[in-house]
Amino acid sequence: MKLDAKSTIEAGKAILGIELGSTRIKAVLIDQENKPIAQGSHTWENQLVDGLWTYSIEAIWSGLQDCYADLRTNVKNAYGIEIGTLAAIGVSAMMHGYMPFNKKEEILVPFRTWRNTNTGRAAAALSELFVYNIPLRWSISHLYQAILDNESHVNEIDFLTTLAGYVHWQITGEKVLGIGDASGMLPIDPTTHNYSAEMVAKFDKLIAPKEYNWKLEDILPKVLSAGEKAGVLTPEGSKKLDASGHLKAGIPVCPPEGDAGTGMVATNAVKQRTGNVSAGTSSFSMIVLEKELSKPYEMIDMVTTPDGSLVAMVHCNNCTSDLNAWVNLFKEYQELLGIPVDMDEIYSKLYNIALTGDTDCGGLLSYNYISGEPVTGLADGRPLFVRSANDKFNLANFMRTHLYASVGVLKIGNDILFNEEKIKVDRITGHGGLFRTKGVGQRILAAAINSPISVMETAGEGGAWGIALLGSYLVNNEKKQSLADFLDESVFVGDAGIEVSPTPEDVAGFNAYIENYKAGLPIEEAAVKFK
């Protein structure tokens, strides 16, 4: 029998998902049909301490408690009840970074987040040693950089984990990590669903002269796949989440995951030959692979889905910020004329006029580099619009070139996958601000990567919903289905989203544009040098 939201919470059948994002901690309660029934949130910001980006341990727990208290208040206001117990809990967070602890469970240095780029020497050395692309933000890069810098705390390390792994450990007592989050610490072997034994051995040999009193595998969290038991909420853990003391201990907690993995779950993109693209302030694509790539690429990061399939990730620092700045310029012009401003209407009009422009943007070029862009080799960036006297300069082409630029770098990375590695994809789901104006961002992205793009209504629910779904998979998977089948049949049933396919003309036009774009990169380099 289907329970209403109030009865679901009263009966302890609701599932809680919490995600610690870079600017917001969000909690979502879902019902037995995996639909959100209550939410809570807390806003926070990272701090720059001694040149490194961090969040304090105090900020983590006060933020989690405030987020849960907000959820509690919202449940009380909406349904007139307390949350006493739950069917399951899941915790996810931003991936990577560095949280080393000693035997007394004390953090040895402030949490170093994924944003820190002080790990260049370590990442380069490990990429060469492992013959595998090791990004700056990965935990193993942070660990080896601390070793290269002769930091005294390294010998005391008893446990090294991520933010999600830390919170899970503190509320359950279990030193475990979901495979997707673990793949952002150290490369995963897709056959064993564990850390690469070869790379672990190479690392231990590399640091052997230091004579530390630990081996790498001893200090890493145990790797778990979606659906595996990962512990229960302890009495101490319940107090750490719910300062009011109403939440009971003993609730099953699913393996903690990273935000990339929960994003894949929230967009139903964990099956091989599917993918998702997040396009907002920054952008990234995640394509679930059928097999390993033929070789490592510096611009492609390899992670996994929460059930262990390999994923090729292309991450771009810039997406819609420059485009938004131009739209705001048109807003100012409208205000100057004394015309009432409706931002949704301005976006709709400007985005849709772009679709009437030349498919190659009439020769116009835009570089949306508010910051540097590793994929194209620029450490710093300058937003830039360039045209020659003979180019077709009109509003439609102007807006189209800025829309193209918002996914141009993403195209360069994905062209390697589709053209060089011959990767096949059946469905890609788009989510984020670029897709808010119906149909336009979809059509642009479809042309860029020559693939049908779907947009779902639910994609905006985000990672907190994604980790709640993984909690549901832990306790509601009576049929013992794969994660992909569970999502298809119990969550997204009948919701394939609205799909837009690329046209041959748009694809040819974008390909011509991207050749101009790549040829013009020295102009962007000059702008960085002289402006």
Name each model-derived stretch.
Residues S41, T113, E499:
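Conserved beta-strand positions that form and line the central face of beta-propeller blades
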Residues M1-P110, A124-A125, E156, E217, ...:
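N-terminal glycine/serine-rich phosphate-binding loop of ATP-dependent small-molecule kinases
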Residues N116:
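Carbohydrate-associated surface elements
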Residues K2-E10, L16-G17, I83, R121-L177, ...:
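Active-site core segments that coordinate phosphate-bearing ligands/cofactors
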Residues K76-T113, N133-P135, H168-G180, G184-D189, ...:
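Short beta-strand-loop/turn "lid" adjacent to the catalytic site in phosphate-handling enzymes
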